[in-house]
Structures are given as C-alpha cells and as structure tokens.
Amino acid sequence: MVTAPSMSPEHGPSGEDTKKASTIVAGCTMDNQIIFDVLSNALHASRILKMSASYQDSLRSMLNRLAPMQIGKYNQLQEWLEDLDNPNDKHRHISHVYGLFPSNQISPYTHPLLFQAAKNTLLQRG
C-alpha cells in the first residue's frame, strides 16, 4: 500500500538514469513513514480506548500492507519506491530520513541496516 500520486517534498529524481523520470510517483518514502506513524499512533490509542477488535485489526492490516523502507544500490535509504537516488545529488533536503528523525522508525538497535542506509544518505547528500 502506497500513496499515489506522490512527490518527494523537495525535488525529483536526478541523474542519467532518470532524465525521463517524472517527479510524480507512487509511494515516496516519507509519505509511507508518515502513514506508518499515523496508523501506529491510531492503533496505540485504540488499545487505550478499548476500541473494537475489528477496528484494531483493520489498522494492523493497513500497517502490514505498507511498502517497507528500502535500501538502494548505493547502500542509501531510498527516497522513492523505485531505486532512483543519485549519490552525487548534493540536494540539501533529506525528507526520506523522517523515519530516523523526527520519527523513531529507524534505530541502530532495532533496524541496524536501515540505520546505516540513513547514515549513508546523510553522507552522500553532504
């Protein structure tokens, strides 16, 4: 499950492989991370409020269907569902590391590979 249409907040894919790529895509990583937070928080609240089991099941089902964060060919956290990142793109925005901060979806303790990919993204972006 992904958002569509979607667009990375700051820019589109760049580089030789993406000259014909559209900036409108399906499932930007930041979108999916925000949706994960919203659904996770709703599930947590539904437990506290003792909402129906079927409602909680529907939230869990949506969480399980979300596209996962992915590590790309340059060992970076992918900004898009497709591996369109360019390691030479020194663009100042890093929306796709929302899962690291301000969210807490990426941690060296719970997801060390994603944490390293987020770190690589920060290093590649300069």
Q: Each predicted region: which residue ranges?
A:
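Acidic/histidine-rich catalytic neighborhood
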Residues: 1-45
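Active-site core of glycosidic bond-cleaving carbohydrate-active enzymes
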Residues: 28-126
